[in-house]
Structure formats: structure tokens, C-alpha cells
Design a protein with these regions (language model features):
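Pre-active-site segment of Zn-dependent metallo-hydrolases
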Residues: 9-14, 21-81, 85, 89, ...
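A short acidic, often aromatic-flanked loop/helix-cap motif at beta-alpha or helix-coil junctions
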Residues: 11, 133-137
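Short acidic-hydrophobic, aromatic-tinged amphipathic segments that line or gate anion-handling sites
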Residues: 125-132
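Extreme N-terminal starter segment of soluble prokaryotic enzymes
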Residues: 1-4, 28
Length: 137
């Protein structure tokens, strides 16, 4: 087992970690996929902070810990990169996630309702709500 950090390494925002359960098999899970914020983005190309610059073909799912933007804000970019696997979250987080993503897209990306709705439609197909004390397999 290994953990690969794709964010929140030199600071606290941009949480995005890959749990590789068995490096011999395509069995990774992504834990969060958040935006970098504040001082951690100063002097850096903002587009490079949004890109998904790691391979996603062996990732079996995304586990969202909670609905703060520094934990979920890059999900639209993950979807745009071709991610099409389950997005696991608690029932409460699963209910909030589309609202948070919609707001983030309107504030930081576009007000084009067609683009926003396309992203939300794709997102809603992938969300899997998990009750507390329920295991995922």
C-alpha cells in the first residue's frame, strides 16, 4: 500500500491524495480533490493549480471526506479529465456536493448555465451516498 499526494503537501489546501491499495493492480482510490487557496496560490499560474496532472485510469473511485472547497473544488476538472468512477460521500455530503460545485463554478469558472448543468448532470450520475457506519467494497 502507498499514498501519493497530489495536493495539500506544502500547505493545507488542495487536499487530494491517492490511496494505492495494491501497486501491482489498478486499485487506487482518490481521497478528496480540492482547490488550492490563498497564500498557497500566490505567484503561481492559476491554471496549473487546477489541472489534473496525474494519471486517473487506475483510480476506482473518489472518496469525499467533506464538502469544503479545498476538498472538492477540483472535481469539475477531474470530470473534465475523463474521470467516470463512483464518487463516495456520506449522505449529507452527497446532498451538499452539487450545491457547492455549482456555486464554485459560478464564482470561479463560468456563469454559462449549460456548462454548469452539464457538469452537475455528470456529477449526479457518479455520486454514491453512503450512510454512516456503512462500508464500501
Amino acid at each position: 500500500m502507498q499514498i501519493i499526494h497530489h495536493g495539500a503537501v506544502n500547505g493545507v489546501t488542495g487536499s487530494c491524495h491517492q490511496l494505492d491499495i495494491n501497486p501491482q493492480l489498478p486499485s487506487s482510490y482518490l481521497i478528496d480533490c480540492g482547490l488550492f487557496q490563498g497564500a498557497e496560490t500566490a505567484g503561481k499560474n492559476s491554471a496549473s493549480q487546477l489541472q489534473i496532472d496525474f494519471p486517473i485510469d487506475n483510480i476506482k473511485g473518489l472518496i469525499v471526506t467533506h464538502c469544503h472547497i479545498d476538498h472538492v473544488g477540483r472535481i469539475p476538472y477531474l470530470l473534465a479529465a475523463g474521470f467516470n468512477q463512483p464518487i463516495y460521500a456520506t449522505t449529507a455530503t452527497a446532498a451538499l456536493l452539487p450545491l457547492v460545485i455549482e456555486d464554485a463554478l459560478k464564482v470561479g469558472v463560468t456563469r454559462d448555465q449549460k456548462l454548469i448543468q452539464a457538469c452537475l448532470n455528470q456529477l449526479s450520475k457518479l455520486i454514491v451516498a453512503i450512510d454512516y457506519h456503512q462500508w464500501i467494497a
